[in-house]
């Protein structure tokens, strides 16, 4: 059986993640990891706070605190939020930890010793007023490719191009706005063209998603160039190269190594051997969940880094790169107060299952999608409550009232066949990371149940004295509910577990390999039935702006950033 390494892009802790960040990486990765466990697969699911680099220094300077003081608070705040969203990490760590820092330094020394690192003198912007070099986001200016006026010195947000500060037109200091002067400084470069030899051929024949292939191949066609891996800033991992005192490793290059160091950290904590078992097995299957702007770092740069170490690390098995989630037709913007952040969301609607399921239903898998409160309301009230919750409540209360909470019978063969077909489609979609499609198949199961119940009319059968037929109908409905609980588990884990217990099934719905029991006979018991979901109030859409403002006022007092 293959070993799966599920990696969610590491949230950068200069802010709290918004809904687009949540669905683009962390939540999608969690749904996939939960599915794999249910299929009995060997899985390790990791991520962590990305906390080094210039954006953190910029924010810390604004607040008059040390970078670590800032990231300590934000890391804990975000980690607790992910727990509230029921994210099932095996390890959610951070880049400023000894295991990661040591692993990064050791890895770059291997790359250096293998001849993939060279030095080159650069002319870099220097702020005479602040008396410092201006790497990455310490410099802002106009993008030379798309003309965006506020492009950062590491990447343009508008067009996604990777940049260096000298590329910017009309550069200025991010702190004081002064025009910089240019000074020479020595830096260490990763020979990306040399290290990436053979990776393009691998990419072309791989089964990576088309959007990943297309984005990467277009990026490669424009020409791979050596990339500077050191920076003239203090907050980061000290560069290990001889003569590189005072330099740090560029945050993008060290953060992607976190997928490896997070597994190594698990071994340090637990005395296990997971790093050898997962990362030293060439047949392991790393699957990365990222936003589309992070594609090159996962499709070319990370594989090139790992290849340059001389170790036989597995190449990406899949890169699930989502498009953008918009908010009511606009891009998320903290500055313009456009969007919903994940702490605000739970204040407006506290049930994490609602957010998990709704965001998966809106997941931007092939194109940008639009989060609207109207669509959220429809998904919660129509899909979760009417399709799933109403079917569950009808079945459970009927069995309790008319059969004393226990029923045995025969499962309808046509229903069995239909469920088996839906299960097969579901498994296929999930392995291909078509999470939105798979969530729709869960709804199809529930709708099948509602249709079957309405057509068979067990209440009529009982009136006509056909008790055995009525028992068969309700036993079949419990069979469908068991399937709904199993297949709902990755998306709405709390509701699935509650349903599992109400239909009297033993153990937990989240036990490893549980999905392999699809098609099994139900327990035929009903225990303490109650509504699985609660509908959002009828005036929710009228009041949501007011509710959101209340939520913002509340979380702004609690946020560390």
UniProtKB/Swiss-Prot annotation:
Listed Gene3D superfamilies: HUPs, Isoleucyl-tRNA Synthetase, Domain 1, Methionyl-tRNA synthetase, Zn-domain
Entry's Gene Ontology BP terms: methionyl-tRNA aminoacylation
This protein's GO CC annotations: aminoacyl-tRNA synthetase multienzyme complex; cytosol
Presence of keyword Aminoacyl-tRNA synthetase: yes
UniProt subcellular location: Cytoplasm
Binding, Zn(2+): 143, 146, 156, 159
Cofactor requirement: Zn(2+)
Renumbered ranges of motif 'HIGH' region: 11-21
Top-tier EC class: ligase
A GO molecular-function descriptor: metal ion binding
EC number per UniProt: 6.1.1.10
Catalytic activity: tRNA(Met) + L-methionine + ATP = L-methionyl-tRNA(Met) + AMP + diphosphate
Binding site for ATP: 334
Keywords on record: Aminoacyl-tRNA synthetase, ATP-binding, Cytoplasm, Ligase, Metal-binding, Nucleotide-binding, Protein biosynthesis, Zinc
Pfam families found in the cross-reference section: Anticodon_3 (PF19303), tRNA-synt_1g (PF09334)
Entry's family note: Belongs to the class-I aminoacyl-tRNA synthetase family. MetG type 1 subfamily.
Job description of the protein: Is required not only for elongation of protein synthesis but also for the initiation of all mRNA translation through initiator tRNA(fMet) aminoacylation.
This protein's name: Methionine--tRNA ligase
Organism: Ignicoccus hospitalis (strain KIN4/I / DSM 18386 / JCM 14125)
Gene that this polypeptide is encoded by: metG
């Amino acid at each position: 059986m293959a070993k799966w390494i599920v990696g969610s892009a590491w949230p950068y802790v200069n802010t709290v993640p918004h809904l687009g960040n949540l669905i683009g990486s962390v939540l999608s990765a969690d749904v996939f990891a939960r599915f794999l466990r249910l299929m009995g697969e060997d899985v390790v699911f990791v991520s962590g706070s990305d906390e080094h680099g210039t954006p953190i220094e910029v924010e810390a300077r604004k607040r008059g605190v040390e970078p670590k003081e800032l990231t300590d608070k934000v890391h804990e705040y975000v980690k607790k939020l992910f727990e509230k969203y029921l994210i099932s990490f095996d390890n959610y760590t951070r880049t400023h930890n000894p295991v990661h820092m040591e692993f990064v330094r050791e890895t770059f020394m291997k790359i250096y010793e293998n001849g993939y690192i060279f030095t080159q003198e650069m002319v870099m912007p220097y702020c005479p007023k602040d008396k410092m070099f201006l790497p990455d986001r310490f410099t802002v200016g106009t993008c030379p490719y798309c003309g965006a006026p506020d492009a950062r010195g590491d990447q343009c947000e508008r067009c996604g191009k990777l940049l260096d500060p000298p590329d910017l037109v009309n550069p200025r200091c991010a702190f004081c706005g002064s025009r910089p002067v240019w000074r020479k400084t020595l830096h260490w470069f990763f020979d990306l063209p040399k290290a990436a030899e053979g990776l393009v051929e691998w990419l072309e024949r791989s089964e990576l998603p088309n959007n990943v292939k297309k984005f990467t191949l277009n990026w490669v066609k424009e020409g791979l160039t050596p990339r500077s891996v050191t920076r003239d800033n203090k907050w980061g991992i000290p560069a290990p190269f001889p003569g590189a005192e005072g330099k740090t490793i560029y945050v993008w290059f060290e953060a992607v190594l976190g997928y490896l160091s997070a597994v190594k950290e698990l071994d340090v904590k637990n005395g296990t051997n997971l790093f050898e078992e997962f990362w030293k097995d060439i047949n392991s299957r790393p699957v990365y969940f990222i936003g589309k702007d992070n594609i090159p770092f996962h499709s070319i740069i990370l594989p090139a880094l790992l290849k340059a170490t001389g170790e036989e690390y597995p190449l990406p098995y899949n890169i699930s790169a989502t498009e953008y989630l918009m908010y009511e037709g606009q891009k998320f913007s903290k500055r313009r107060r456009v969007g919903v952040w994940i702490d605000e969301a739970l204040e407006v609607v506290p049930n994490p299952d609602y957010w998990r399921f709704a965001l998966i239903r809106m997941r931007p898998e092939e194109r940008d999608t639009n989060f609207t409160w109207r669509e959220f309301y429809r998904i919660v009230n129509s899909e979760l409550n009417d399709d799933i919750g109403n079917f569950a409540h009808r079945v459970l209360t009927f069995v309790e009232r008319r059969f004393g909470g226990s029923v045995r019978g025969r499962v309808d063969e046509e229903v069995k066949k239909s469920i088996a077909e839906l299960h097969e489609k579901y498994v296929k979609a999930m392995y291909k990371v078509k999470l939105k499609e798979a969530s729709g198949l869960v709804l199809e199961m529930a709708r099948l149940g509602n249709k079957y119940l309405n057509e068979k009319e067990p209440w009529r059968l009982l009136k006509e004295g056909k008790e055995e037929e009525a028992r068969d109908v309700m036993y079949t409905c419990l069979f469908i509910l068991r399937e709904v609980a199993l297949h709902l588990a990755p998306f709405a884990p709390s509701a699935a577990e509650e349903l599992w217990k109400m239909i009297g099934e033993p153990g937990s719905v989240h036990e490893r390999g549980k999905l392999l029991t699809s098609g099994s006979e139900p327990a035929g018991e009903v225990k303490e039935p109650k509504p699985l979901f609660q509908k959002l109030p009828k005036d929710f859409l009228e009041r949501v702006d007011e509710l959101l403002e209340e939520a913002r006022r509340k979380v702004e007092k609690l946020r560390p950033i």
